[in-house]
């Protein structure tokens, strides 16, 4: 009797394992399809205000994606999940806004032939039925009418370049407990948003600092983050002329760069870099909204802003001999 009772318990423990079989459907081509949204647009002056929302042109066609569910799938209905890595900053009219950068939030509305209109991110949305779901054959993911909205969170000058990134990864499953492991398609975006408010820096010319020849051993002697002995900082005054920006407006200038280590712009020689500072020698941290030089335009919407620069050791090591350069960008913003 004890032995029979033990076998019965073993069978009962086994049944849930068979029921826990996960149905994760995949793209019929084996890799996720990218559905790309070009955000490039031109705002007018009234659009470039905090809180303003701009609806971009609708992508009205079907996304053109087919999914396949694994063999052994029971039932012919599916669920769809739209997952993002971005934080939701707020909602309005159903739209859930995600932070795209320091100036803009983005949100999307999608229409499905069965589920109707919904606003991602959302998980396990009940979709319709298709006979191919249980047959291990392709079936259409019937998303269409993708509508993208942009909300201004900070006024900007000239333009904002939005690098390519994935906004949503879209998963197809058959239950609300299936893991979200393999996306069927992704929704990505990039673009450039231009505004009428513009400022020309240094009459459109490159601001260049040339420090001549510096002994390689001086960098290793200086140590990480320090200027080589005997090398002086250089100062320049940058002219700024703005258009469609109100006279006497308070603006700021800051530094943007691609290769950065703390407050240092790393050069094409990884052991060497440059520090950009305000006229008092306080370093500016690249790509940091709060590290800036405030200034006020005059009655003709112009200004003069002083900056300083000097070379530093990035690693504390002796750099390879040869010419080294670094590139950064001066960006003017509303204060």
Where are these regions (language model features)?
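Bacterial N-terminal signal peptides that target proteins for export
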Residues: 1-8
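Cleavable N-terminal signal peptides
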Residues: 9-10, 20
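N-terminal signal peptide c-region/cleavage motif recognized by signal peptidases
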Residues: 15-19
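Mature extracellular/passenger domains of Gram-negative fimbrial/pilin and adhesin proteins
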Residues: 21-335
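Intrinsic-disorder-associated interaction segments
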Residues: 1, 13-14, 141
């Amino acid at each position: 009797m004890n032995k029979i009772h033990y076998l019965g318990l073993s069978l009962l423990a086994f049944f849930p394992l068979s029921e826990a079989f996960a149905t994760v459907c995949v793209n019929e081509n084996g890799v996720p399809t990218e559905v790309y949204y070009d955000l490039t647009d031109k705002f007018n002056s009234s659009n470039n205000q905090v809180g303003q929302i701009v609806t971009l042109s609708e992508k009205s066609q079907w996304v053109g994606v087919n999914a396949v569910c694994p063999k052994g799938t029971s039932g012919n209905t599916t669920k769809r999940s739209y997952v993002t890595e971005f934080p939701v900053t707020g909602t309005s009219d159903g739209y859930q806004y995600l932070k795209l950068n320091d100036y803009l939030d983005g949100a999307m509305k999608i229409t499905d032939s069965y589920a109707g209109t919904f606003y991602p991110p959302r998980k396990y949305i009940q979709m319709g039925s298709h006979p191919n779901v249980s047959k291990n054959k392709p079936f259409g993911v019937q998303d269409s009418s993708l509508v993208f909205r942009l909300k201004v969170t900070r006024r900007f000058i000239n333009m904002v370049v939005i690098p390519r990134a994935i906004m949503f990864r879209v998963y197809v499953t058959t239950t609300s407990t299936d893991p979200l492991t393999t996306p069927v398609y992704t929704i990505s975006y990039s673009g450039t948003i231009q505004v009428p408010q513009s400022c020309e820096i240094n009459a459109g010319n490159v601001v260049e600092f040339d420090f001549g020849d510096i002994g390689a051993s001086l960098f290793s002697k200086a140590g990480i983050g320090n200027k080589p002995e005997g090398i002086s900082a250089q100062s320049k005054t940058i002219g700024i002329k703005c258009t469609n920006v109100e006279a006497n407006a308070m603006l700021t200038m800051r530094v943007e760069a691609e290769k950065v280590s703390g407050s240092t712009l790393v050069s094409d020689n990884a052991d060497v870099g440059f520090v950009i500072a305000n006229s008092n020698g306080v370093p500016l941290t690249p790509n940091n909204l709060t590290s800036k030089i405030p200034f006020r335009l005059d009655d003709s919407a112009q200004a003069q802003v002083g900056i300083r620069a000097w070379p530093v050791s990035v690693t504390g090591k002796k750099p390879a001999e040869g010419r080294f350069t670094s590139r950064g960008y001066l960006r003017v913003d509303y204060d």
